[in-house]
Amino acid sequence: MAMKRKLNEHDVPEPESPQSPKRRASDASQSEPASPPAPTPAKEVVASFAELQLEPRLLRGIRDQKWGSPTAVQSKAIPLALQGRDILARSGTGTGKTGAYLLPILHNTLLRKGKTSLILVPTKELALQITKVAKALSAHCGQAVRIQNIAGKESEVVTKAKLADNPDIVIATPARASANINTGALAVTELAHLVVDEGDLVMGYGFKEDLDQIAQNIPKGVQMFLMSATLNTEVESLGSLLCNDPVVLKLDDLDKDSKRVKQYVIKCAEEEKFLLIYAMFKLGLIKGKTIVFVGDTDRSYRVKLFLEQFGIKSCVLNSELPLASRLHIVEEFNKNIYNILIASDETEILGSQKKADESRPKKKPKTDKEAKNDSGVSRGIDFLNVSCVLNFDFPATYKSYFHRIGRTARAGKSGTAISFIIPKDKYRKHKSTTFAGCENDEEVLKKVEKHQEAGQKLENYNFDMKRLEPFRYRFGDALRSVTRIAIREARIKEIRLELSKSQKLSRYFEENPEALAHLRHDQTLNHPARIQPHLKHVPDYLLPGGSRKPADVGFVGLNVPRVNKRQYVKGKGRKVVRRNGKVDPLKTFNARGKGKK
């Protein structure tokens, strides 16, 4: 079949000019729209986002976010994504995975209107966080990019209204996305991109059936992004289900230089955990913002109420609080309003880790899948500029340990991780402070040491417990005052406070956003009668030698001033008269008789 010649401006075929076979082959390849461009190898490191040839409006949004240069995962993934390749990426926390898929999706959305992108995440908190980042990056795009978040619990009427105008980007959990696809509210016929963020968590939280149903409904040719911190068997099976010949990026080695976490271990008794955390914060041994990880929510409030006795303020990230309150706590923590955040990873104990140690005590899982998945905080949520991660209760698995310490030393910064370990012979020796999850601390510690990366190791924290002996009598009274009843009252009090703020003041804060800064989440939850004000101050005699110099108060005389002397002599010997003018018999009684001495 003869090839058609190119027409000129007068619709007349131009004579075919002789050209090289290579040029002719390239022209033939351009005339076939079905064949994708040949993938070019991505650069190891890209100096700036401008080199990625992104839409100019997105580059302005990137500058507003003060993103410097692309991270390793962004340098590798974005050029491949712009070529239309499916991406299966393994990269640690804090390495810029969110930007690696958001930027190419936003770029393609601006070029091709009428297409939809679906982003699946394991939790509502992560969905809101991604929504915020996507809106910030597309701030200069006006109405060209419409973003909707349907991960939260809301009525079907509200969700249908959000999806009625076919938004460009939809963010949801797999359960919510599957439900809305079944009802027809979420149309996937024009789906261009599908993202599964934190793939290992999505599979661990039991969304396999929802993902299978979504995979059956999406059309062919959808570009896939699968992001995960680990590539286990479940994630690889998910990749084979959704992806078509994906590019596998394993970028842990490229990000090792940015992980500068100094890891320390302190082996102590159960009650000594409270003594150590009191001394560390009160004596200023921990600098900067700190996340304290504990076993469960009750444990969070026990630590908070204990620290309140000494005037140490902290806030609890409680899964029972309203979603808006939890996100506000994270935002305020990132703004350096709070320095100590107490969090729990209840999903670890609820069994989200499939290969967790069977000897661990198991709690009954909640019936509501969404409620269960909202409680974990060691993954997904971004905490900025965290200096220290304190494992008050050691995690249940070695994977959870690495996820926890991944909250610090992000974006090339250094950080510290300190872990309290309960030896076997000291477990259950102090019933009021014991925690069932600490029974196998030493076994989990061995697994952590076994899976350490090259150049990383756990060191013993050199802490002389004898120097803390003077503090024991102070911390003992404070610890005894934190009873189960006090913890229950504190939890109820905080939930009532946060519900009141969320319901009654939501409209007010929409109209007056500056007043939101006055909300504090580190309020005192202790009953006033339980707080002893003198415990807030550490006397000099309790401090180790040389920690604080005695104050110079000058010369203190022992003589009574003359004025006071005269007043004392003048008033001496006077009869004490009652208010009614009568003589006090107790002061004037004389056993020998009147007038006799």
UniProtKB/Swiss-Prot annotation:
Binding site for ATP: 91-98
Cell compartments where the protein resides: Nucleus, Nucleolus
Entries under Gene3D superfamilies matching the protein: P-loop containing nucleotide triphosphate hydrolases (3.40.50.300)
Record's catalysed reaction(s): ATP + H2O = ADP + phosphate + H(+)
Pfam families associated with the record: DEAD (PF00270), Helicase_C (PF00271)
GO biological process: maturation of LSU-rRNA from tricistronic rRNA transcript (SSU-rRNA, 5.8S rRNA, LSU-rRNA)
Enzyme nomenclature, EC number: 3.6.4.13
Record GO cellular component, one term: nucleolus
Name of the molecule in the record: ATP-dependent RNA helicase DBP9
Organism: Phaeosphaeria nodorum (strain SN15 / ATCC MYA-4574 / FGSC 10173) (Glume blotch fungus)
Gene: DBP9
